[in-house]
Amino acid sequence: MCRYAPCRRQVYLYTTSCQWAPPLILNNPRPISVSKPQLQYYNISITSPATRTYSNHTHLYHDTRNLPKPALQLQTRKMSSTSTPLTTPPTPQPDPRYAQLFHDLSTRFAQTSLPPEKWYILAISTIVASPDPERCDQLYLHLINQAPYSTPSARQELIRRLREALFKSIIIVGVCKPIEAILAISKYEREEDKDYTFTRENWQCDQANHDRGLAWLEKLYARNTTGTLDFFRAHQDFGWLSKEITYGLFLSDRGVLDDLDTQMVVLPAIMSQNLKNETHWHIRGTRRLGVCMEDVKVVWECIQRVAGFYGTVLDKVPTVEEVESDV
């Protein structure tokens, strides 16, 4: 490579040894250069990237430091027409021990004249009353793996029934256990399976609520209604609670569960706590609803089955035979 600086027809050659050679005096005023293979340089014209042209020059040096940088051309990759579509993840399976428990309960109910969907109301009511109410989620998983509950609409109807059973159980077992249960279930709910209905949005503690609650109370207690309420003559807050809240707000609502569904909440939740008097009253009340003695025995045995599953002994509750004379 050479550089030249014309001065009085003197040319200074910069040799390949990186030193300036002695000046040459030339008669030719035009600069000369040492022949050497020319390097290729590209002079990018200062235009937009779309119209920019590139020309081949043989200039030995061209300063392009202040030229704009070419715009970055983003490359987009088209999705393959054979791309695998997104698939719904498989439904989780319940614990095998619980699956066996639920199989036993549903099999026993199938031997009765009771509607087949009543068994899981008993199941959720006994589990929420147990030492481990969060395992209501196992019942939900078991059910949604069954063919009748494979669609979002069927699962929405299912969760309405399970949720109402848990809500009714609040007045039997307290509020904390049902809250733990519904939170555990909600972890497995898919968005399309959720139900946003609000059954008690417009509830009022009014005369209609009082009449509805008292009517349901009298249906179960019949001739024993007055005598039972008289237990609370010296504790009238409890009498008010029974009529306005227990039976008015909670147990007489028929927006989701029917009469028999409600008894499949109340009797199992009470009996699971090994409560003598209330178990007697609600074995009797279930018989008064028209459930035959043999079917009530199956209900009693299923409650004992769930209690035994958790290692709970129900030794204070009466048998169905012991209550029969009071029906």
How should each PLM-predicted stretch be described?
Residues C2-R3, C7, Q75-D258, M293, ...:
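Acidic, glycine/proline-rich low-complexity segments that act as flexible tails and inter-domain linkers
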Residues N27-N28, N43, N56, N66-K69, ...:
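Detector for Asparagine
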Residues M1-M79:
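N-terminal mitochondrial targeting presequence
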Residues D258-M271, L275-V327:
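Alpha-helical oligomerization segments
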Residues T16-C18, Q38, E117, E201, ...:
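Short, low-complexity intrinsically disordered segments
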